[in-house]
Regions:
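Conserved C-terminal structural/oligomerization subdomain of aldehyde/semialdehyde dehydrogenase
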Residues: 1-3, 56-59, 247, 285, ...
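Short, well-ordered beta-strand elements within core beta-sheets of diverse protein domains
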Residues: 58-64, 81-85, 173, 284-288, ...
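Rossmann-like NAD(P) dinucleotide-binding subdomain of oxidoreductase/dehydrogenase enzymes
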Residues: 149-295, 423
Length: 509
């Protein structure tokens, strides 16, 4: 039996020794995936994939540069002109993506293990949260394929007007490392469903699961060249993809600063479409009349400490009414210490893994030190957990006595760091929440429906949760206001963004 088969059959109940054994046997693909097969980089460049829990190299991977992006785009262009994918009957394309979803589900243990080793996500989270969401994403967009409809408009007698929806052509997707396969699927699935060809550049820090996904697409019946994956960094590989004259659209998730660069690359090249999902500094607002403080606290710490705080919509700003502030902080600290257990991410009992790299860890710790220098008070955390010095760990951290002008209240940290701020009334809470360059998400906790409705209308965010945080399904558009981006992922709205309309006017007179 192959290593992949062993991993595929691994039950979710495996303990740490079993996962560690499987990790040692795992067959890791190291090439670029172009034209239906793994290939070496043309210039022979390579880079190491590092396990952030141990600091050890997992594998030496091919590094794609401009020449490899050219090769991948050329493969996609050949597939586009051949028409086997874009002209495939909708039901047939649906069958391929449905089969791909089934293969992802069958290989979820292998894919989860790749993500845990690659970026430090606890294996239990990867297996029970991320991978089921990836499967749901491909299934949802498979079901959407035959729902893409055109229109016949009312016109004068003797004329016929048709409006058709067509794919764009070649889509360049640049995905982040925090949810490697899930964030890639939010781009790849709708782009493929609409009939496009795709060149994916996964994050250099965590490309392994995306490389495997491309091979599963071929196994599902996808034509070679329709879906290609090129490893590499942002300044070389990502830039080449965003500048390429044959790419019709770039979809990017990452920092606001890089998003601005990509918009510039579109202007420098062919005015390609640019879809950006960028930074966030999401407020969670807790009104004095909320119904269940314990339940609110449970969701509050999950909103910032899950995935070690490496979430674009992380609820890192905790705006708490003065009347419940002290009780909130006490419960938050007590429960967070009970729930988040740093450790080996291959141990199913671990609930907090490392951050993605040692460099990122040092950046998060520097932000914590800056918060202390600015006068905020540490209520918990503030450094590295003991006994895990070999990995890139950061303890769950909570600041109190935070003022609106402090860096920890304004800058995205992308780590397990939360800041509590007091407010006196609804108007002040809204003003504090909206005082940000970001507008990705927000939440409101109140038992008063009128209050909730007013605040939903007033908050400058693309997603607002009421008495919950992070909930939703594939029907929910996800994206932000202001410098959090200009697009929506998930939902049918996202699918339309990978199409263009064509108007056909017939003179029948």
């Amino acid at each position: 039996m192959s290593t992949r088969a062993l991993v595929t059959e691994a039950p979710q109940t495996l303990g740490q020794p079993e996962w560690s054994t499987l990790a040692k046997k795992l067959d890791i693909e190291t090439g670029l995936f172009i034209d239906g097969e793994y290939v070496e980089a043309l210039q022979g460049k390579r880079f190491d994939s590092i396990n952030p829990a141990t600091g050890e190299a997992l594998a030496s991977l091919a590094f794609g540069d401009e020449s490899d992006i050219d090769r991948a785009v050329a493969s996609a262009k050949r597939a586009w002109h051949a028409g086997h994918w874009r002209y495939m009957a909708p039901r047939a394309r649906m069958t391929v993506l449905t089969r791909l979803a089934e293969l992802i589900d069958q290989h979820k243990a292998e894919l989860a293990l790749l993500e845990t080793l690659d970026m430090g996500k606890p294996i239990t989270d990867a297996l029970t949260i991320d991978l089921p969401e990836v499967v749901s994403t491909f299934r949802y967009y498979a079901e959407c394929i035959d729902k893409l409809e055109g229109a016949v408009t009312n016109t004068a007698r003797g004329a016929l007007h048709l409006i058709q929806r067509e794919p764009l052509g070649i889509v360049g997707a640049i995905s982040p490392w925090n949810y490697p396969l899930l964030m890639a699927s939010w781009k790849v699935a709708p782009a493929l469903a609409a009939g496009n060809c795709v060149v994916l550049k996964p994050a250099q820090q965590a490309p392994l699961s995306c490389l495997r996904l491309a091979q599963l697409f071929i196994e599902a019946g996808g034509p070679p060249g329709v879906f290609n994956v090129v490893n590499g960094d942002g300044p070389v590989t990502g830039r080449a993809l965003a500048l390429h004259m044959d790419v019709a659209k770039v979809s990017f998730t990452g920092s606001t600063a890089v998003g601005k660069l990509i918009m510039g690359y579109a202007g420098q090249s062919n005015l390609k479409r640019v879809a950006l999902e960028t930074g966030g500094k999401s407020p969670q607002i807790f009104m004095a009349d909320l119904e269940d403080l314990d339940a609110a606290v449970e969701r509050a710490y999950g909103g910032i400490f899950d995935n070690a705080g490496q979430v674009c919509n992380a609820g890192s700003r905790l705006l708490v009414h003065r009347d419940i502030h002290d009780a909130f902080v006490e419960k938050f600290v007590a429960r967070s210490r009970q729930v988040y257990r740093p450790g080996d991410p291959l141990n199913p009992a671990t609930t907090l893994g490392p951050v993605v790299t040692r460099a990122h860890q040092q950046g998060v710790l520097a932000k914590i030190e800056q918060g202390c220098r600015e006068g905020a008070q540490l209520a918990m955390g503030g450094g590295e957990p003991g006994g895990l010095e070999q990995g890139a760990y950061v303890s769950p951290t909570l600041f109190t006595c935070v003022e609106q002008g402090m860096s920890i209240a304004r800058e995205e940290i992308f780590g397990p760091v939360a800041a509590v701020q007091r407010f006196d009334d609804e108007a002040q809470a809204i003003a504090m929440a909206n005082d940000s360059i970001y507008g990705l998400a927000a939440s409101v906790w109140t038992r008063d429906l009128k209050t909730a409705h007013r605040m939903v209308q007033a908050l400058e965010a693309g997603v607002v949760w009421v008495n919950c945080f992070g909930d939703g399904d594939m029907t929910q558009p996800f994206g932000g206001y202001k410098q959090s981006g200009n697009t929506r992922d998930k939902s049918f709205e996202c699918l339309l963004g990978y199409t263009q309309s064509k108007s056909a006017w017939f003179d029948l007179a």
